[in-house]
């Protein structure tokens, strides 16, 4: 069992940015898909859904979660669970970074329903390319 150290902690490169840092996925040889999301204040993750369940563990910050049922605020320590194919969007409504871990039981097959909002950027990292496995 390898232990991968220093997997978390990337930050957006621009003020209106966010980071998607892949921690486990098929490139790691895992069936599950796990990534760290880091979202700058004011940034909105566009409407999308996944073919699998998504579980989000919020480590830092606070935001707004939107679904067809409405909007609800969330903060550090909360867990958000989306069943398969539930359309959702997340917004950092606070003044600090949101840091959250997203878990999927398999390839999420994400379907994005709209483009990035003007001025927003996404930095994507695959930790398998830079993390050091410890045997």
Regions found by a protein language model. Give the residues of each.
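Short acidic-glycine-tyrosine-enriched beta hairpin
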Residues: 69-84
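A short, N-terminal "cap"/entry segment at the start of jelly-roll beta-barrel domains
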Residues: 1-31, 115-135
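A generic "binding-loop/recognition-motif" signal
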Residues: 51, 70, 86-87, 96, ...
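Conserved short histidine dyad/triad with adjacent acidic residue
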Residues: 34-50
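A short hydrophobic beta-strand segment most commonly corresponding to one strand
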Residues: 81, 95-112
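Short beta-strand His + acidic residue motifs that chelate non-heme Fe in jelly-roll/DSBH
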Residues: 46-47, 65-66, 82, 88-94
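Glycine- and acidic-residue-biased ligand/ion/polar-headgroup-sensing regions
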Residues: 53-54, 58-63
